[in-house]
């Protein structure tokens, strides 16, 4: 009986082997299609399991998912996604993405370092380099950030103003020339002035004007590569590849500046830029530790030694953070003021009043503390048209973001900042440009949790005071030196996404010299009280 069973099974086995062998030999396409079907099924099942019950595409386009949408993002598509619910999702190639649109969920993500870490964008580590401090986490991030805090103290910010003002004076002349004959697009000139301001603030005059122009051109490629999700492999001559090459170019300039700055500080000279300020703090710490004498004056902060490469990578990240965001804000700011001449008039009156009619009074922090209405204008612009809409994070471990949904490990989770800044309960008529809402006792100043322009939590923007002061100083000085008109088009109010937001038509303006003597500043009244606004500003920025 057993023999008969064995004899029966052997031919059957041989038959199966023969059949499989035949298929493999003569029907390779069948095998390929079968494997493809298995991969598609796995990709789809994986997406459905990660998606759970939250809104998102019902089915994922095999393998690529929403890649085509990610290549050409629009504000309208983002906004439609936010409207689908507090949490929604998409999938692009290998990356599952969860988007949080509500304020409290966004704040929860930003304040959950044990679950998430910044990734900027999917290719961020490849472009900015994985050793960049912005990708540090936990204790390492805290220690590194401590070494940077001294660069943004009140004293340090004051020391940067002369270089910033010199850039404004230079580029205001270029603004006049750029639209001498007719209206011209100003998105690029605004990017140029911000790159120049950043380079002069960060590196002083260790970087030449020609080098600044070169850096601006290279940074355009870096920005272009910073799409939310890129093709997973870096192929030659793709956006990410060009972004990496541009990073290498910019790094060479910063490395050279760091070496020269270190040499200058070791010689005992006073710091005149952010890079020198940082190296000076290192030298002071080193001296204090080496002398180890009783009664020796202890530096305000003891920091470790940072290498030239660490310094350069840090300023690479600073330039990325400041250049795109402030370029966006400045473009919207000039456009909004041209569209609201009554607001521009109030800015001019304030600027001339605090300067007592002298437009050549140099910038100082004391002077800027008096620019209360100008500050309100800047804050309202940042609220209405926030440069950064969302901040991508990588999930380190399964993240129970709500009681009924857990974001899977290695997914990307994105807190949205826009919703909190357009909450009609806090900002009535949120689509209206109204600087008066920032009066010291107004609802806006009483709701600091909604002020999320610069993020929140342990990775909140380190240079937010610098960025706001830069915008206040620039627009304040421009208001009394320049006049400008805006040529509106059907796309003027459409938000284009290029890392940050810009007017779709790239902002058509025409500049001309302004005669400050035409402003009756002596009889003008203060919009807000200086003391009240200063106190409210501190509260809002520290929330």
UniProtKB/Swiss-Prot annotation:
**A molecular-function term among this protein's GO annotations:** oxidoreductase activity
Pathway per the UniProt entry: Steroid metabolism; ergosterol biosynthesis
| Catalytic reaction list | 5-dehydroepisterol + NADPH + O2 + H(+) = ergosta-5,7,22,24(28)-tetraen-3beta-ol + NADP(+) + 2 H2O
Q: Name one GO cellular component term.
A: endoplasmic reticulum
Pfam families named among the record's database cross-references: p450
Q: Which cofactor does it need?
A: heme
Set out the biological process GO terms recorded for this chain's protein: ergosterol biosynthetic process
Give the EC number(s) under which this enzyme is classified.
1.14.19.41
Source species, domain of life = Eukaryota
Q: What class of enzyme is it?
A: oxidoreductase
Which residue stretches, if any, does this entry annotate as coiled coil? Answer: none
Subunit architecture: Interacts with dap1.
Q: Give a short account of what the protein does.
A: The third module or late pathway involves the ergosterol synthesis itself through consecutive reactions that mainly occur in the endoplasmic reticulum (ER) membrane. Firstly, the squalene synthase erg9 catalyzes the condensation of 2 farnesyl pyrophosphate moieties to form squalene, which is the precursor of all steroids.
| The family this protein is said to belong to | Belongs to the cytochrome P450 family.
Protein name, UniProt field = C-22 sterol desaturase ERG5
């Amino acid at each position: 009986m057993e023999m008969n069973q064995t004899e029966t099974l052997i031919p059957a086995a041989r038959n199966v082997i023969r059949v499989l062998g035949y298929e493999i030999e003569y029907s390779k396409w069948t095998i390929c299609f079968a494997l493809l079907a298995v991969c598609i099924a796995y990709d789809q099942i994986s997406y459905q399991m990660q998606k759970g019950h939250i809104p998102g595409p019902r089915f994922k386009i095999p393998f690529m998912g929403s890649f085509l949408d990610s290549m050409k993002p629009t504000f309208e598509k983002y906004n439609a996604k936010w409207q689908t619910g507090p949490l929604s999702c998409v999938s692009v190639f290998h990356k599952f993405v969860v988007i949080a649109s509500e304020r409290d969920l966004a704040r929860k993500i930003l304040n959950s370092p044990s679950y998430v870490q910044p990734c900027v964008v999917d290719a961020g580590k490849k472009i900015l380099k994985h050793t960049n401090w912005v990708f540090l986490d936990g204790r390492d991030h805290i220690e590194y950030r401590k070494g940077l805090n001294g660069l943004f103290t009140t004293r340090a910010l004051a020391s940067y103003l002369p270089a910033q003002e010199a850039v404004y004076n230079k580029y205001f002349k270029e603004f006049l020339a750029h639209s001498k004959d007719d209206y011209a697009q100003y998105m690029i000139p605004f990017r140029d002035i911000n790159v120049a301001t950043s380079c002069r603030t960060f590196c002083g005059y260790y970087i030449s004007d020609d080098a600044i122009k070169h850096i601006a051109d290279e940074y355009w490629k870096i920005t272009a590569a910073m799409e939310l999700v890129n093709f997973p492999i870096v192929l030659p001559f793709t956006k990410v590849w060009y972004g990496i090459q541009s990073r290498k170019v910019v790094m060479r300039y910063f490395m050279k500046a760091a070496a020269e700055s270190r040499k200058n500080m070791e010689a005992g000279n006073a710091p005149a830029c952010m890079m020198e300020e940082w190296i000076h703090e290192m030298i002071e710490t080193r001296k204090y530790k080496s002398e180890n004498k009783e009664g020796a004056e202890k530096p305000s902060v003891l920091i470790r030694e940072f290498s030239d490469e660490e310094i350069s990578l840090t300023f690479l990240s600073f330039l990325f953070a400041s250049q795109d965001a402030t370029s966006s804000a400045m473009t919207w700011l000039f456009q909004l003021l041209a569209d609201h001449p009554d607001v521009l008039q109030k800015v001019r009156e304030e600027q001339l009043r605090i300067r007592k009619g002298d437009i050549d009074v140099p910038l100082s922090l004391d002077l800027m503390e008096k620019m209360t209405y100008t500050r309100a204008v800047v804050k309202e612009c940042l609220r209405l048209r926030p440069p950064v809409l969302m901040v991508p994070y990588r999930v380190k471990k399964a993240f129970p973001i709500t009681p009924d949904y857990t974001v899977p490990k290695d997914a990307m989770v994105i807190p949205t900042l826009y919703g909190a800044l357009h909450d009609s309960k806090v900002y009535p008529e949120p689509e209206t440009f109204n600087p008066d809402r920032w009066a010291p006792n107004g609802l806006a100043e009483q709701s600091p949790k909604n002020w999320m322009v610069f993020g929140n939590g342990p990775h909140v923007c380190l240079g937010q005071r610098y960025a706001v002061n830069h915008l206040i100083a620039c627009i304040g000085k421009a208001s009394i030196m320049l006049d400008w008109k805006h040529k509106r088009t059907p796309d003027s109010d459409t938000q284009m996404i290029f890392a940050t937001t810009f007017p779709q038509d790239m902002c058509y303006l025409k500049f001309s010299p302004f005669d400050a003597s035409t402003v009756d500043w002596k009889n003008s009244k203060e919009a807000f009280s200086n003391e009240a606004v200063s106190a409210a500003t501190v509260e809002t920025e520290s929330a």
